[in-house]
Amino acid sequence: MVKKKKIFFLLYSMHVGGVEKSLVNLLSTLSREEYDIHVGLVFPEGDLLPLLPPDVTLHPVTDISQYWNELKQPPLDTICGYIRSGRIIRALAAFFVYLRCKVGRSYYSWVDNFLRGVSGIEQTFDIAVAYAGPSLDIDYYVCYKVKAVQKIGWVHFDISRFGIDRKATRLLYGLYDRIYIVSETGKKIFDQIYLELREKTKVYHNVISVSSVHEQACIGESFCDDYKGKRILTVGRISPEKGQKVAIKALKLLLEKKYDLRWYFVGDGSDMGTCKAMAESLGLNDSVVFLGEKINPYGFMRNCDIYVQPSRHEGYCITLAEALCFSCPVVATRFTGAEDQLINQDKGVVVGMSAEEIASGVELFLT
């Protein structure tokens, strides 16, 4: 009998998101005869947590969560917090680390200051994957605190558009054995920025089970408002990089041309209040519907008339791939991976990121 390989994936949580969904899909494809699967979560929580296969071993990574505030808030906030609590020596030490970071233009030393002394994962693995990458704390932890024969970084987005610590990423990924990138375009961009790492990179598309998506569409909720016009749908976290505000402006332009439309947004996030206020200020309260976060949005995807992905940047967009499982026309902005995903799609179009260009793309499927 062949010995199973122990493989470990590290990410932050299982809250609803593209990275988390892609992990669930990936784990469903791994052979249980070949792999003994382990998942580390900084916070073992989230609506997608029950979707992890029952044979997966879960590891809460308190090494990172105990320093969460220090790692994620601005360093000066941490230093001021130390001063307010009377920890003057710690504040001085942290301040000198902060100065080193500013001079070196990298926050590697800041993360190292907190994570260098943690114990790490006790077990040894054949493969360890920093799945939520590039993320400085995740990449650091897998690099130095997880014992494994092979270490893999996983890049889920366009690193030219997302604010990563390039110096730290170069250092850490230089110590990895392989770097998987979720789209051809994403790999090309990564290789241009990190020429010395290009021999380590390989495209690994996010996995989508078309049959599973269709099955879930049959049992999930869908539109229930008896609207008779055209329904446009966007699924994704309500945040600046996902482009919902531009989509609302595009809807305004389309309604001015007398199209009978209603735009539905599935998701939740930091921009929800701003988007609702924008819809109200533009007089679109009856034409914009916020449906909230849905673990299973596939009934909406199946029954919408047009699906729009207005993102500012992506890597390989999971929600776009899921929408393509159905027959509705798809409009996507020109983020990394969009053209890769929509190639050979008769009912798909890639447009620019302005409201005018998105509106024009939608209009192609209204006339």
Report residues per predicted region.
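Short acidic/histidine- and often glycine-rich active-site loop of Leloir-type glycosyltransferases
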Residues: E322, F335-Q345, V349-V350
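A short, active-site helix/loop in glycosyltransferases that binds the activated sugar's phosphate group
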Residues: I138-D139, D177-T201
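Short hydrophobic beta-strand element within catalytic cores of glycosyltransferases
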Residues: P329-A332
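Acidic anion/phosphate-binding donor-loop and adjacent secondary structure
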Residues: S160-D165, D191, K202-G229
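Conserved acidic donor-binding segment of nucleotide-sugar-dependent glycosyltransferases
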Residues: N344-A355, L364-L366
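Aromatic "clamp/platform" in nucleotide-sugar-dependent glycosyltransferases that forms part
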Residues: E293, R312
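A conserved mid-protein helix/loop that constitutes part of the nucleotide-sugar donor-binding site
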Residues: E20-N25, K230-L253, Y259, S270-K276
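Short alpha-helical segment that forms part of, or immediately flanks, the ligand-binding pocket
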Residues: Y298, Y316-C325, E339-D340
